[in-house]
Structures are given as C-alpha cells and as structure tokens.
Amino acid sequence: VGFKAGVKDYRLTYYTPDYPTKDTDILAAFRMTPQPGVPPEEAGAAVAAESSTGTWTTVWTDGLTSLDRYKGRCYDIEPVSGEDKQYIAYLAYPLDLFEEGSVTNLFTSIVGNVFGFKALRALRLEDLRIPPAYSKTFIGPPHGIQVERDKLNKYGRPLLGCTIKPKLGLSAKNYGRAVYECLRGGLDFTKDDENVNSQPFMRWRDRFLFVAEALFKAQAETGEIKGHYLNATAGTCEEMMKRAVFARELGAPIVMHDYLTGGFTANTSLAFYCRDNGLLLHIHRAMHAVIDRQRNHGIHFRVLAKALRMSGGDHIHAGTVVGKLEGEREVTLGFVDLLRDDYIEKDRSRGIYFTQDWVSMPGVLPVASGGIHVWHMPALTEIFGDDSVLQFGGGTLGHPWGNAPGAVANRVASEACVQARNEGRDLAREGNEIIREACK
C-alpha cells in the first residue's frame, strides 16, 4: 500500500542540508565534477544513494525497512575555489551500514560502485572521518611506535633503512651479503623491494635463510638489534601466512606486506598474526599512485593511510617531499600526523577535512623512501622528526666505496643532524654545513 513505481531524483531523498551529523556517523568528503547539466545537489545525492541504500529506481522492498535509519546523506556541498564546476560534497553514513573491523567492507560500500557513475565526470574521495565507535572495532597497528622502539631499544632519532638493489636478479646469497654490509655499517633495517616475492632467481625460503644469517651476524658485531623487512606477500593468504610463520621461526623481528596489491583482508589477517607472535609489520603501498595520483579522480592517500592504520601496520611508506616521488610538504605532513598522532584537528590547508580522534589506537611510523641521499638528511630530519624511518636504497648502495661505507655515511649524517637540531641549530639553513662537518 502506498508504493509508487518509477524513477525520481536522488536529491529528493538523499540530499538533506539540514541534517545534524552524529558522533557515530562515518563522514566522507568527495571532490566531484558533475556532468554538464547535472546540478551538484543531484550529483552529491547520487553518490550518497549509490554508496548506501539507493538504486536507480524506486523498489517496493523500500517499504520493508527504514530508509531514514540506513541511508547515506549528502548534507553539505561547497564549490572548489579556482575550479570551474567542481564541488566538495560532504556525506554522512550511519554506522549500521558497515561490518565491524572490516576495511574491505568499508571500501566496498563507500568507493565500490560510485566512481563509474554516469552523472559524474570525475570523483575523488578526499577524506574520511572514522568515529571512535567504529575505529575501536579494528586491530590497528600490531604494536605501534612506542612498542617498536622498546623492542629495538632505539630512541631519540629517526630509524634508518635501505632497500636492497638491484631489486630483482640477485641470488639469495649475494642478497644476504648486501644485507649484512648495510646493517654492519650502521643501518637499523634493510628491506625487500615490493616486487621481491618468490621468483625463479631467488625463492623466498632461500632469501629468508641467508638474510637471517646476515641479520644475526650484523647484530653480534654491532651490539645493536637489526631487522630486515622479509616480504611475506604471496599469491594466496595461506602462502603469505606460511612465509610469516617461517620468519618468526627464524627469529626475524619484522615482516613486510604490499597492502594494496595483497588486499585489506590479507593485510588484517597478517596484522593479527604479527600481534600474536611479536612480529613488527612493515607496509609498502605499491599501486597507490594508480589510485591517488589524479587530482580529480580516485582516492587521496590520506584515506588509504587511515585505512592502513585500521587494517594494521607498524610502518607505511609516505613519500619524501624531497626525493624522486611526488609529495607536497603540507599535505604529506597532514597524513603523517594522521598516521602517528592520537588526535588530529581539521586543517584544510593540510588537506584534513575532518577532526580525527583515534582514541587509543597505536600510531604508525611513516617511511620516507624514494630517491633520497645524505644531502637530504637535514631536510628529512626537520620534516619527519624522530618518529619516522628514513630509507636510502641507491643512497646507500650507490656509495662509491661500497655498501657498508654508504650505510656509515647515512648513520653519521643522521646522528649529526639530530645532534645539531638538539643544540638548536637551523637545519634548513645550516644543513649542508652540518653534513660537511660530519664528514671530517
């Protein structure tokens, strides 16, 4: 009774400018570019509908549930300054729409279906506000920043790493040799490249064994705890877990996962294992630029960073600001804070659309990696501070005297910059002089 078939504008149901958002709502900020002739209110409402309870036509089963309780809402729209016919649409989703502890379900709902919508020329998810009522259902980082420092017994400075190069083609024994030389020279970590899994030239078990030998030899010689990010990423979750188990049996302190290519479900499963078994979890963001590089379409990395903090990871690559890969300083610092801090205020100048309260969820160490070397050390120390991992691949292995001297150069430069900063010197102005003094 009362059902009337037909198609009606989305905005009649899903555009609600008077809606007062709730503390438990998941809030989203979408940058949308509607097709010519499509009003922004209709476009915003269409996104809200298609990412929650709506479809293209009225259906009689709408009468069997409460749309007011379950529907997403577009509650505000603002034009983007300097952009023609581009808008920020603010959406609110009731918490009941999402499975607890599942980034997979969260993304399937909010971004799973709306990006190919005809009414839109382009759509980009700029930010999400995750309420504590939802974030508390996630595992979060297996250990977090403070526990990692306690495990490693390393405080008061950035951690230093190196990606072993060439990334593909080395035998397991030569790979282990490069690991040993870098760790002996003073680095805290070495790293499998993201596409090092288990290829014909170097099967994963052989690599793990030679790396473990290098790890323990370097530890014995330096008296410091060392780590190598053993990449457990595999074609199946079962194989991934087998590799993580073997890493634990070898006594390795940390494993690695490519969380976007491996998937959120696999990542969360690995995070649970790492927490239960005392392994740190390093996360690489391979494939992120496919999703986040276009300014008008896709998902901003700050959203992927929040998703990773919930799904689970102790480190994640976060750009460098100064190296070979793209990254704007203020925006990068915005999502670095979203990774590390407990409470982050809304700050549009840094791309943060919503205040985010992580409550007691541990933080994630941002990893600066990609085209950096010792002359970048003052800027990196100033930009990222102590709670970070600075990772020099070619910046270590490209040293003219070899791998170990390259590692020594990075360690000396880092400690010189930290000491100079602690003495009150201006790293931005005096950085080159500080590095030259350290070389003597």
From Swiss-Prot:
<dbReference type="Pfam" id="PF02788">
    <property type="entry name" value="RuBisCO_large_N"/>
</dbReference>
<keyword id="KW-0460">Magnesium</keyword>
<keyword id="KW-0120">Carbon dioxide fixation</keyword>
<keyword id="KW-0560">Oxidoreductase</keyword>
<feature type="binding site">
    <location>
        <position position="167"/>
    </location>
    <ligand>
        <name>substrate</name>
    </ligand>
</feature>
<keyword id="KW-0113">Calvin cycle</keyword>
<feature type="binding site" description="in homodimeric partner">
    <location>
        <position position="113"/>
    </location>
    <ligand>
        <name>substrate</name>
    </ligand>
</feature>
<feature type="active site" description="Proton acceptor">
    <location>
        <position position="284"/>
    </location>
</feature>
<feature type="binding site">
    <location>
        <position position="317"/>
    </location>
    <ligand>
        <name>substrate</name>
    </ligand>
</feature>
<dbReference type="GO" id="GO:0009507">
    <property type="term" value="C:chloroplast"/>
</dbReference>
<dbReference type="InterPro" id="IPR017443">
    <property type="entry name" value="RuBisCO_lsu_fd_N"/>
</dbReference>
<comment type="subunit">
    <text>Heterohexadecamer of 8 large chains and 8 small chains; disulfide-linked. The disulfide link is formed within the large subunit homodimers.</text>
</comment>
<dbReference type="InterPro" id="IPR020878">
    <property type="entry name" value="RuBisCo_large_chain_AS"/>
</dbReference>
<dbReference type="InterPro" id="IPR000685">
    <property type="entry name" value="RuBisCO_lsu_C"/>
</dbReference>
<keyword id="KW-0934">Plastid</keyword>
<keyword id="KW-0503">Monooxygenase</keyword>
<feature type="active site" description="Proton acceptor">
    <location>
        <position position="165"/>
    </location>
</feature>
<keyword id="KW-0150">Chloroplast</keyword>
<keyword id="KW-0602">Photosynthesis</keyword>
<keyword id="KW-1015">Disulfide bond</keyword>
<dbReference type="InterPro" id="IPR033966">
    <property type="entry name" value="RuBisCO"/>
</dbReference>
<dbReference type="GO" id="GO:0000287">
    <property type="term" value="F:magnesium ion binding"/>
</dbReference>
<feature type="modified residue" description="N6-carboxylysine">
    <location>
        <position position="191"/>
    </location>
</feature>
<dbReference type="InterPro" id="IPR020888">
    <property type="entry name" value="RuBisCO_lsuI"/>
</dbReference>
<feature type="binding site">
    <location>
        <position position="194"/>
    </location>
    <ligand>
        <name>Mg(2+)</name>
    </ligand>
</feature>
<feature type="binding site">
    <location>
        <position position="285"/>
    </location>
    <ligand>
        <name>substrate</name>
    </ligand>
</feature>
<keyword id="KW-0601">Photorespiration</keyword>
<dbReference type="GO" id="GO:0009853">
    <property type="term" value="P:photorespiration"/>
</dbReference>
<keyword id="KW-0479">Metal-binding</keyword>
<feature type="modified residue" description="N6,N6,N6-trimethyllysine">
    <location>
        <position position="4"/>
    </location>
</feature>
<feature type="binding site" description="via carbamate group">
    <location>
        <position position="191"/>
    </location>
    <ligand>
        <name>Mg(2+)</name>
    </ligand>
</feature>
<feature type="site" description="Transition state stabilizer">
    <location>
        <position position="324"/>
    </location>
</feature>
<comment type="function">
    <text>RuBisCO catalyzes two reactions: the carboxylation of D-ribulose 1,5-bisphosphate, the primary event in carbon dioxide fixation, as well as the oxidative fragmentation of the pentose substrate in the photorespiration process. Both reactions occur simultaneously and in competition at the same active site.</text>
</comment>
<dbReference type="Pfam" id="PF00016">
    <property type="entry name" value="RuBisCO_large"/>
</dbReference>
<protein>
    <recommendedName>
        <fullName>Ribulose bisphosphate carboxylase large chain</fullName>
        <ecNumber>4.1.1.39</ecNumber>
    </recommendedName>
</protein>
<feature type="binding site">
    <location>
        <position position="163"/>
    </location>
    <ligand>
        <name>substrate</name>
    </ligand>
</feature>
<dbReference type="InterPro" id="IPR036376">
    <property type="entry name" value="RuBisCO_lsu_C_sf"/>
</dbReference>
<comment type="similarity">
    <text>Belongs to the RuBisCO large chain family. Type I subfamily.</text>
</comment>
<dbReference type="GO" id="GO:0016984">
    <property type="term" value="F:ribulose-bisphosphate carboxylase activity"/>
</dbReference>
<feature type="binding site">
    <location>
        <position position="369"/>
    </location>
    <ligand>
        <name>substrate</name>
    </ligand>
</feature>
<keyword id="KW-0456">Lyase</keyword>
<dbReference type="InterPro" id="IPR036422">
    <property type="entry name" value="RuBisCO_lsu_N_sf"/>
</dbReference>
